[in-house]
């Protein structure tokens, strides 16, 4: 029930005692829930104008208007603690091109496959100019191990035993990300590194 959702969302919002909220969607229900939650300053898209809504242009225009600035950039840049970046620097050979391989994925239909990744790594290893880091979730260690078993050379590091906050500096420090999971691609992009 749509009305029940308004009240449950309003109750959830009340818990946080927000003074101000920014709604990046033309939703009357979210607006009403915010009003019911007692939020004083509610900034929102024009209501009932969902048709032909261009998400990027609308967000840019809205943000520029609310912040009273002329132009709002559409890209983000992630900021990573310098100590975390330094802590992973010993894993990188700066004389080589360092690639994070994102072999894990949330669904089986989006996986490129261990054979494809190991073949790619073996082909690139013929040039002797690369280091590789295998990024998989903790429940995908077998994928990382299977790739590593098929790769000739010792220029590969398994990241599957690391948590998210530990792998982010690896992705940000690498020269490139190649993978099927969007997490690595997002971090790579926000770090100004190419991804494929």
Predicted regions and their residues:
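Catalytic machinery of carbohydrate-active enzymes
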Residues: 1-196
